């Protein structure tokens, strides 16, 4: 069985719900941060080849200092998160812990149209039983299968940046709210990955459901930035078809 990923999109979301410039890289050494700041572009996607970056460009030193300060702050937060006892994603314990907690992935359904969802409230309060067989949902199975591949792609494109895996993290101020981020980089940048089963990926667009999910995750982790990644994967059984698709 052969796999091909069609495209990957990187978007930056800040915790104030404003989508900023699309950014394809963060890095741990100052020169790379400088080049990253110089290469930022509004409403566009740009891959940066660090071997071709001109480090002599005139830039705002205050902006550089602020960026480095932010990264250092994020790293301190990351260090604290790593020390916390966490519940590994998709384990029996993880599913049980989510049953009576509102999680970041529930936010859109819980408050869409400015209305509180009675059905979600009843499930979380265990007034009604949630009989959903999540393993039988094709879109969830698809995303779970390809998420590790998308994570590796993201890491490789970003100079093999280390990504820490997290399970359920409970809000320190509200034990009834939690989040399970897909990962957090060594720079303290959150990563949220979607591998849609059938939904078309649209450039410069993040579904509202996922915007709210990311805001919830950032709030729980006390972080401010998230790279949102979407990967479209194709499963191709025939080698000739694979070669044809690859060449296209």
Predicted regions and their residues:
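Charged, glycine-rich intrinsically disordered N-terminal tails and low-complexity linkers that flank
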Residues: 1-145, 149, 157, 235-237, ...
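Short, well-ordered alpha-helical scaffold segments within catalytic/effector domains
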Residues: 147-151, 211-214
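Active-site region of the double-stranded beta-helix
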Residues: 154
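Nucleic-acid nuclease catalytic cores
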Residues: 157-181, 185-248
